[in-house]
């Protein structure tokens, strides 16, 4: 039964990836169908992630009160329903509503997946390693979603609506598994008074600041890589440009998945996690700068691959290193705080890139991402110096 619980937790983080990358996967097609510009598309992304910010803070205490299963079932159900709404919404307003509902479903699954994974994998002894392995399946979602979108849109010549509906059907299958699985009772005692106290902990504050930078980077890449590559390939009207751009987005997800699987093979990753975050942040700065200056699609793809590999260990290692400084009973509280704070970056930075790209190019707006990566590098220098691990693997 514990294995099935782990499987559903992995399905949950896989589905969160679908929620985060689906708009980027159909960006060119959706913008053409709705006749909207980059700024309006960026507002859709902001609607999704602003909802995530609010819901992430609320869903923690609900999980403690109701248990994992109701939240998992709700998450899969709402995520599937919002994907169907996104698929068949006839106008911009309903697409925005779909994005809002997508945020609700995503954060239900995010809480279930990311709080269960460090407990059920590696017997709970190495949170950073477990988080990397679990979030490799998030990376898998980043691969499969744009790959399926490209297959459906460009090979099978399906509409973006039909393509998204098929992906929504996949999430419905995951719902069946959640309904059939027994979950452990929630072990985390999320109380508002406890959360307030945690906000004063330097380790929690640093993790939140680091995730603001990281989420701004990951969501920006997931949202704008396809549009960036379409620009470098000559525009949407050039034959095959959108399909090749979609494959570039898939390669970004593939690099993240591979990087997280590799990171999960590092024993006692929690102990060396701060150094890993620092090195990955520095590599991210270099790769993003290359994306900004290059005019070559091939060089851009190489930079995208390096960016995916660099991003791979950052989020799960930040989470794991921070968890290791506290008792497991506080994991839900800590995750709710740092992820909700981090989502502020994912909410506003991609939207800002979109607004700055109107009448210009996505490539010309990417320096914002380079600055975020640089700030993350500076913050990472302090993560290992604040707080002492409560337990070792």
Q: Where are the model-predicted features located?
A:
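Extracytoplasmic
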Residues: 4-38, 110, 114, 221-226
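Residue-level signature of mid-helix packing/kink "hotspots" within the transmembrane helices
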Residues: 21, 49-57, 143, 253-261, ...
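Extracytoplasmic gate region of multi-pass secondary transporters
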Residues: 23-24, 202-250, 257
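Helix-breaking motifs and short loop linkers at transmembrane-helix boundaries and internal kinks
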Residues: 35, 67, 88-93, 271, ...
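Conserved MFS/SLC helix-loop-helix module at the cytosolic interface between two early adjacent transmembrane helices
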Residues: 54-90
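Cytoplasmic helix-loop-helix junction between adjacent transmembrane helices
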Residues: 98-136
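Helix-loop-helix hairpin linking two adjacent transmembrane segments in secondary transporters
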Residues: 132-183
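A late C-terminal transmembrane helix in Major Facilitator Superfamily
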Residues: 323-362
């Amino acid at each position: 039964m514990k294995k099935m619980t782990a499987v559903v937790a992995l399905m949950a983080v896989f589905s969160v990836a679908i929620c985060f990358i689906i708009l980027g996967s159909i960006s060119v097609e959706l913008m053409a169908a709705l006749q909207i510009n980059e700024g309006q598309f960026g507002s859709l992304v902001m609607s999704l992630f602003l909802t995530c910010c609010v819901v992430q803070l609320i869903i923690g205490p609900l999980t403690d009160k109701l248990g994992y299963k109701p939240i998992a079932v709700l998450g899969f159900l709402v995520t599937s329903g919002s994907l169907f709404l996104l698929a068949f919404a006839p106008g911009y307003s309903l697409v925005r509503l779909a994005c809002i509902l997508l945020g609700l479903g995503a954060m239900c699954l995010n809480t279930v997946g990311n709080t269960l994974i460090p407990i059920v994998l590696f017997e709970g002894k190495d949170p950073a390693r477990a988080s990397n392995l679990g979030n490799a399946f998030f990376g898998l979602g980043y691969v499969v979603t744009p790959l399926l979108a490209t297959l459906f849109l460009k090979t099978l010549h399906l509409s973006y609506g039909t393509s998204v509906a098929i992906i929504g059907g996949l999430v419905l299958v995951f719902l069946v598994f959640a309904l059939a699985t027994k979950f452990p009772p929630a072990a985390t005692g999320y109380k508002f008074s406890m959360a307030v106290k945690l906000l004063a902990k330097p380790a929690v504050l640093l993790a939140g600041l680091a995730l603001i930078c990281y989420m701004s980077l990951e969501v920006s890449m997931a949202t704008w890589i396809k549009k960036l590559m379409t620009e470098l390939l000559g525009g949407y009207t050039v034959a095959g440009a959108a399909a090749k751009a979609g494959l570039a987005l898939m390669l970004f997800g593939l690099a993240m998945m591979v990087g997280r699987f590799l990171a999960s093979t590092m024993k006692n990753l929690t102990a060396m996690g701060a150094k890993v975050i620092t090195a990955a942040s520095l590599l991210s700065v270099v790769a993003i700068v290359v994306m900004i200056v290059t005019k070559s699609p091939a060089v851009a793809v190489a930079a995208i691959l390096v960016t995916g590999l660099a991003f791979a260990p950052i989020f799960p290692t930040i989470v794991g290193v921070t968890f290791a400084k506290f008792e497991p009973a506080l994991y839900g509280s800590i995750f709710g705080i740092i992820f909700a704070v981090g989502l502020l970056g994912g909410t506003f930075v991609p939207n800002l890139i979109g607004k700055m790209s109107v009448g210009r190019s996505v490539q010309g707006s990417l320096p914002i991402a380079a600055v975020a990566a640089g700030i993350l590098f500076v913050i990472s220098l302090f993560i290992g110096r604040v707080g002492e691990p409560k337990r070792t693997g």
